[in-house]
């Protein structure tokens, strides 16, 4: 009886962690784990999604992150779109988290493995002791040259690269989602440390430099930093989120002026 009681308590605690994580950000929404799909087209589609996710190899998804952390990749990265600068790894982590929250044990196992590997990458970046690398969890190619010049206001490498912050945002979101949907505390810690990196890497830039930098596709950096503020109530995250708000776009829209013609929908919309 004691064993059964302890088991029930542990299960209840795990479920409450997931619920608390989601309610921390989305108080008007119910947790994914509260829904059980019955046989039908929605369950069929969900199961197909999971089956497709499980065809991928986590070590190949993680290869860009290990490489940029100075660690030997365990397997070669995927080619083509899946290997484009490492950003698909963040998408993959989000997908694992969402499906783990619906009860997929294999997705949960893979999610936890990826988080453990990303912890190794962050630790390796911290051991480098370089001014750009502390708390970095990115897989962007040539990260050392890119971010060491970027933090000084030199955007020559940044603008010559394929959408660095768009890329990194996917891993910010993946780590957040692993905590948000599954209550994974290690993912939460990694997410907040990565947000600390974003605060630090932009701290020396003027408002004018930030606005210029945001002319390059930058994903939802303002969103994830605002989420970090909602989680911790630490003002530094909200301040940084506001710096990532592209005023050239948002100011006219706040005044009901349409400024979207000829802009890139995936960036501005």
Residue ranges and their predicted role:
Residues 19:
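Conserved binding-pocket/active-site segment within a compact domain
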Residues 22-269:
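Glycan-recognition and catalytic cores of secretory/periplasmic carbohydrate-active enzymes
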Residues 1-10:
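Sec-dependent signal peptide recognition
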Residues 13:
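Active-site/pore-lining binding-face segments in mid-to-C-terminal subdomains
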């Amino acid at each position: 009886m004691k064993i059964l009681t302890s088991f029930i308590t542990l299960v209840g605690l795990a479920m409450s962690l997931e619920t608390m994580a989601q309610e921390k950000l989305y108080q008007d929404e119910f947790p994914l784990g509260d829904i059980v799909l019955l046989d039908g087209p929605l369950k069929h589609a969900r199961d197909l999604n999971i089956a497709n996710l499980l065809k991928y190899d986590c070590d190949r998804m993680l290869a860009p992150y290990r490489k940029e952390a100075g660690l030997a990749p365990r397997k070669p990265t995927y080619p083509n779109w899946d290997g484009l600068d490492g950003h698909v790894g963040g998408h993959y982590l989000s997908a694992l988290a969402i499906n783990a929250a619906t009860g997929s044990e294999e997705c949960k196992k893979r999610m936890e493995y990826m988080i453990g590997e990303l912890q190794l990458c962050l630790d390796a970046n911290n051991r480098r002791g370089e001014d750009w690398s502390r708390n970095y969890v990115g897989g962007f190619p040539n990260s050392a040259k890119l971010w060491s010049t970027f933090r000084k206001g030199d955007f020559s490498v940044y603008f010559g690269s394929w959408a660095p912050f768009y890329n990194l945002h996917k891993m910010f979101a993946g780590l957040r989602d692993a905590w948000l949907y599954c209550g994974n505390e290690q993912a939460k810690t990694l997410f907040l440390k990565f947000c600390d990196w974003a605060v630090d890497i932009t701290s020396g830039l003027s408002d004018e430099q930030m606005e210029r930098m945001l002319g390059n596709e930058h994903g939802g950096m303002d969103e994830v930093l605002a989420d970090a503020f909602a989680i911790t109530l630490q003002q530094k995250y909200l301040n940084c989120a506001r710096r990532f708000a592209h005023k050239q776009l948002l100011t006219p829209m706040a005044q009901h002026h349409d400024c979207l013609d000829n802009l890139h929908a995936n960036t501005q919309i």
